[in-house]
Amino acid sequence: MTDPSVVHARAPAPDRIGRLGAGVRGLMQHAEEAAGLAQRPGLLQGLDPRAKVAGAFALILAAVATRSLLVLLALFVLATALAAASQISPARLARQVWIVVLGFTGMIALPALILVPGTPVLSLPFGLAITEQGLRAAAFLTGRSETTATLALALVLTTPWPQVLKALRCLGVPRAAVMILGMTHRYIFVLADLALDLFEARRSRLVGRLSPAEARRLATGIAGALFERALALSSEVHLAMLARGWRGEVHLIDDFRFRPRDGGALVLAAAILAGVVWAGSVWP
């Protein structure tokens, strides 16, 4: 395995190393901003984490279960309004959720426009046609993805991650699942910190440019060194946590307090879900 600390006669282009490091720093900055946002005054910030998790889950189920585009649009507007009332700007939602989800689900939903049989609304070459049913299927896929992603982001940005994990345990999620979520979240930032150290070490040794083939070999060496260090560190961290009595349960200094407004929010979310399910059974 190539040791990335070895000084080469030439080094990779500064812009390439800079872009990689900037991406890792952007991840760390996003985590800091999210932690700060969870402490701001806002509608969702003032609710009990258990009510937020259960309510978000109910609204996500409603978005998945609805058979009406108007109801789905109303749920999307509700999710956006909840985010805005919690100091999450539409620009942030567009940057972190809407554009990404639209691009990803759009590529998946695009074939449905012509593959779903139905009433043609637009003729295309080679005997193809965009159908009304295809447009409806694509709209449902995109709308459900946008709505559920907006609700999930609003939950995560307004609730510290340890509180989310504890709320999941309080709602009956298995300890193994919560443990996996907690360790995954923690090791993402462990890997990011290690990667940032490697990029900075390489950047300090820049003396020129590498050929594309040499740059790829160097990137492979950095990736291998990162994986090796992360594997060793993860084992050490896990053993240290076990030695300190960690068994997968989430313990916080402050206990949750369920207040009347938390109950009201939970009842409202449950009523929306029940209304969507009832409407779907009455008007299939």
From Swiss-Prot:
Q: Which domain of life is it from?
A: Bacteria
InterPro entries assigned: ABC/ECF_trnsptr_transmembrane, ECF_CbiQ, ECF_transporter_component
Which spans are transmembrane here? 57-77, 97-117, 176-196, 263-283
Instruction: Kindly state which keywords UniProt assigns to this record, in alphabetical order.
Output: Cell inner membrane, Cell membrane, Ion transport, Membrane, Nickel, Nickel transport, Transmembrane, Transmembrane helix, Transport
Record localization: Cell inner membrane
Q: Name one GO biological process term.
A: nickel cation transport
Any one cellular component term from GO for this entry? ATP-binding cassette (ABC) transporter complex
Protein's membrane topology: Multi-pass membrane protein
What CDD domains does UniProt report for this protein, alphabetically?
EcfT
Family affiliation: Belongs to the CbiQ family.
Oligomeric and partner information: Forms an energy-coupling factor (ECF) transporter complex composed of an ATP-binding protein (A component, NikO), a transmembrane protein (T component, NikQ) and a fused possible substrate-capture protein (S component, NikMN) of unknown stoichimetry.
> What exactly does this protein do?
Part of the energy-coupling factor (ECF) transporter complex NikMNQO involved in nickel import. The complex confers nickel uptake upon expression in E.coli; can also transport cobalt with a very low affinity.
Protein name in the entry: Nickel transport protein NikQ
Q: Which organism is it from?
A: Rhodobacter capsulatus (strain ATCC BAA-309 / NBRC 16581 / SB1003)
Quick one: which gene encodes this? nikQ
